[in-house]
Amino acid sequence: MPDGREGAMSGGGAEARRHSGRTGAGETKPLQAGAGLLFLREEEIRLAQDLLFFAYRDFTNVADLILEELGLGRAHHRALHFIGRNPGITVTDLLGILRITKQSLARVLSVLVERGYVAQSPGTDDRRQRLLTLTETGQALERRLFERQRERLTAAYREAGAAAVEGFRRVTRGIMDDEARAYVDGAERGAPPNPHPRGA
């Protein structure tokens, strides 16, 4: 019995080439946005879930090996990353980015502060605020973790090419909610973090 792919590719070789992006001369061209919408089929979406899962697993695993040596976990890594990206970030803003409970973040920060990776200082305008920065030791650890993950990401970028990298960014951005997009927009401009752009 014909399956969904056979039905979608029916209508002659020209139609098949239009959906696949092939020109008929052995060359390929980028698919137009929405061309055939074959990528919206259920199996394609499930495959995308597989891709996201395995990519995240293997991307984080290269850093996990270092973290395990130090008795740390991914929650500590995420905190190190965003504190390093935003020196002087408040605990409130970090909570807005990570979306974990205050108790969970308190446990994470307690370990990082006790081990000398993170320093806390009171806010200049509001002394009740706690501003977070990485110490030299914390910067060194964050850099070590970054270099491991950069190797994996750089290799993937080089293999895929510039057009695919741009497509990857557009897809991942499309998955994010408005607050995450606002943060990324600010990071691209070099602006301070704003995890609650709508006053949430």
Regions found by a protein language model. Give the residues of each.
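N-terminal leader segment of winged-helix/HTH proteins
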Residues: M1-L70, A200
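Hydrophobic/aromatic-rich alpha-helical bundle segments in the mid-to-C-terminal region
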Residues: L38-E42, I66, L153-A163, Y183-P193
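N-terminal helix-turn-helix DNA-binding core of bacterial DNA-binding proteins
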Residues: R57, N61-S104, R115
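DNA-binding alpha-helical recognition surfaces that contact promoter or target DNA
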Residues: R107
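Exposed, interaction-prone assembly regions rather than primary DNA-binding/catalytic cores
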Residues: E166-A200
